[in-house]
């Protein structure tokens, strides 16, 4: 079966991500008007390269928190007589609110604040004065953009960010705003899919275990008798050991007594029942639970000799020929537990 991955623009809940961005940064309201700074006599280069790095924590598909560093660029005040420069950078903390448009594309906004540092300098040949000052402060940050999941772990974003009132004109001579359009890439940690929970294989059905034992009646009993002989007791002792070793779950045993066809059918039926019961009584006395074993007389049914003795007329010879029909069969049936080895 092939694995199917669904990309999501937002990272998984309760995971971290980190990335960087690069873009076009532009200052607005850039004139010098305070603390001895004065306007230049040439063009002002108010757009520069901006860059940043950020890290975040995704709470759920709609909410995350980000912290980042931004270099907002250096603005040059050009002039052949009077010139100067202004630059700013800062650390920001924002809440990121997102909403999915498709499975792999989100729109989002970020709202928060930036702790910034602003530096300015001026060289004024017209007055023979040079100035250099810096200032720090906090300004609100607003940003909006779209984020696209390239892979499960990698996402890109296109964003426009606005920082209001950077610097104090009374200190650094100006108080510009900054807008930055950037393209960012982030790596999301912990996006691996959890291992699927494999349901354990159902326990195999127990196997039915059946075993047959056949004992010659001539070993167990004297001819035409139902009392066990000493040799018969020894044979049953050996049988008991085998039955004890089997130990099938929910096992039971049926003792079937058979006779030959000599004598009346009714007599043979009665004799087979007595012989079967004698075997049961002996095995119960040895320790087999009485509820687990039963006796059944089968009379002269199911002969194993077939018609092989049909032409035997002498009684003694017929008794010998029909000896295989005189038997006791024990059928043990139960359930055997099937043990499967766990797969590595």
From Swiss-Prot:
Source species, domain of life: Bacteria
Keyword vocabulary terms for this entry: Cell outer membrane, Conjugation, Disulfide bond, Ion transport, Membrane, Porin, Repeat, Signal, Transmembrane, Transmembrane beta strand, Transport
S-S pairs: 309-321
Self-association and partners: Monomer and homodimer.
Similarity annotation: Belongs to the outer membrane OOP (TC 1.B.6) superfamily. OmpA family.
Comment, domains: The extracellular loops are most variable in sequence, and in some bacteria confer sensitivity to phage and/or colicins.
Name by which UniProt lists this protein: Outer membrane protein A
Species whose genome carries this gene: Klebsiella pneumoniae
């Amino acid at each position: 079966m092939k694995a199917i991955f669904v990309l999501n623009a937002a990272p998984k809940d309760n995971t971290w991500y980190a990335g960087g961005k690069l873009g076009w940064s532009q200052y607005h309201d850039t004139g010098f008007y305070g603390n001895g700074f004065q306007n230049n006599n040439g063009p002002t280069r108010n757009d520069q390269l901006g860059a940043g790095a950020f890290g975040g924590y995704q709470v759920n598909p709609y909410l995350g928190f980000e912290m980042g560093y931004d270099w907002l660029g250096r603005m040059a005040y050009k002039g052949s007589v009077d010139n100067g420069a202004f630059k700013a950078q800062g650390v920001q903390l924002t809440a990121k609110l997102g909403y999915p448009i498709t499975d792999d594309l989100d729109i989002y906004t970020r709202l928060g604040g930036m702790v910034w540092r602003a530096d300015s300098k001026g060289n004024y040949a017209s007055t023979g004065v040079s100035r250099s000052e810096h200032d720090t402060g906090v300004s609100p940050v607003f940003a909006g953009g779209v984020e696209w999941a390239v892979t499960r772990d990698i996402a890109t974003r296109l964003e426009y960010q606005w920082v209001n009132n950077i610097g104090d004109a009374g200190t650094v001579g100006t108080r510009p705003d900054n807008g930055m359009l950037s393209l960012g890439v982030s790596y999301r940690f912990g996006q691996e899919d959890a291992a699927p929970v494999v349901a354990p294989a159902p326990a195999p059905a127990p196997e039915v275990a059946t075993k047959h034992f056949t004992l010659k009646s001539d070993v167990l009993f004297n001819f035409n008798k139902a009392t066990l002989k000493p040799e018969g007791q020894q044979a049953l002792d050996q049988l008991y050991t085998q039955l004890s070793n089997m130990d099938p779950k929910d096992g039971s045993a049926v003792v079937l007594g058979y006779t030959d066809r000599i004598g009346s059918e009714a007599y043979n039926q009665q004799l087979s029942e007595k012989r079967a019961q004698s075997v049961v009584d002996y095995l119960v006395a040895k320790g087999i639970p009485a509820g687990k074993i039963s006796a059944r007389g089968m009379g002269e049914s199911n002969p194993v000799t077939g018609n092989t003795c049909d032409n035997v007329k002498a009684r003694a010879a017929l008794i010998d020929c029909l000896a295989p029909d005189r038997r006791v069969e024990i059928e043990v049936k139960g359930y055997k537990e099937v043990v499967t080895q766990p797969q590595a």
